[in-house]
Amino acid sequence: MRLLAVVVLALLAVSQAEEGARLLASKSLLNRYAVEGRDLTLQYNIYNVGSSAALDVELSDDSFPPEDFGIVSGMLNVKWDRIAPASNVSHTVVLRPLKAGYFNFTSATITYLAQEDGPVVIGSTSAPGQGGILAQREFDRRFSPHFLDWAAFGVMTLPSIGIPLLLWYSSKRKYDTPKPKKN
C-alpha cells in the first residue's frame, strides 16, 4: 500500500513538473572569423519544448559593451508576447567589433512566464565562449589574394630566368648560321 502511494505521488509530481512552458535557448556566432570593423552576426534560437505557451518572453544580452561593439542591425533586448508550445523563434543581431583582441562571448538572459499566473522563470542561453577578434590588417595579411606580392615575386624572378635565356638565344644565333641555298 505504501509503495502504491509513493508511486502515485511520484507520478503526480512528474505530471505537475511537465506542465507549463519550458524554453531552450541557444546563442551562436554565424561568422567563421570575427574581424575588427566587419559585421559579426549573432543568432539566438529559442525553442518551447513545454506543453503550454510561454508568455512575456524577454531576451536580454548585456555582454556587448557599446565602446567595443556597434550595432548594425537588430536589438540586443527583445520581447515576445508568447511562444506557442512545440515551436521556435529565431532572432538575429548584426554587430560591428570596434577593437581587436580576445573577447568572452557570454550567455544571454531569458525570462518568461511558464504559466499565466506563475512565477517568472529566468534562464540563460548557451555561451559561445572566448573568441578572438582579428585586426583588419591581420585578416588581410592572412586571407587576401596577395596580387601585389605575387607581382613583385614575378619581377624579382625575371632576371634569374631572363638572363640565361638571353645568353642562350645570343649563342644560338651566333653559332646557328643558316646554310646557303644552292641555285
From Swiss-Prot:
Signal peptide location: 1-17
Domain of life: Eukaryota
Topological type in the membrane: Single-pass type I membrane protein
Glycosylated position list: 88, 104
Residue intervals annotated with topology Lumenal: 18-146
Annotated transmembrane regions: 147-167
Major site of localization recorded for this protein: endoplasmic reticulum
Pfam families: TRAP_beta (PF05753)
Record bears the keyword Membrane: yes
Transmembrane found in the keyword field: yes
Cytoplasmic side: 168-183
Annotated coiled-coil segments of the chain: none
Subcellular location: Endoplasmic reticulum membrane
GO biological process, one term: in utero embryonic development
InterPro entries in the record: TRAP_beta
Family the UniProt entry places it in: Belongs to the TRAP-beta family.
Assembly: Heterotetramer of TRAP-alpha, TRAP-beta, TRAP-delta and TRAP-gamma. Interacts with STING1.
Protein name: Translocon-associated protein subunit beta
Organism for this UniProt entry: Mus musculus (Mouse)
